[in-house]
């Protein structure tokens, strides 16, 4: 990859994280959670049988950090953990009613954010944007698959 392309990709990453407004300290989506905490809670919401190990693998984040966040959520009454039979040391993470409500608030906030930022675009432009995002996701997923294949050999 040439230097110009690398700089452009990094510039876009900085632009997009700023556009999403995820770097602000403090609450995210009208919750008392930081962006990483909100993301972890939302992943539990959309993957109801996930374990801490599954979260770490899916989000590619540190086990210690996930453990601290899950302990905080448990203390705050947002989740419970249930031992998975036959899986040594694994516990399924289960949202409480309060955890589901918080996740739904995050979900609604995400919808509102996208509507506020992109609602003025016409359908053709939104379609182009979605196709561009699909292309990026597919390209990066293919790279991951290739890397995994190389590592298995």
Predicted regions located by residue number:
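A structural signal for well-ordered alpha-helices, especially hydrophobic packing surfaces
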Residues: 20, 48, 103, 137-144
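Terminal interaction helix/tail motif
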Residues: 5, 108-153
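Short, flexible helix-adjacent loops and helix caps
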Residues: 21-29, 78, 83-84, 115-118, ...
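N-terminal leader segment of winged-helix/HTH proteins
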Residues: 1-35
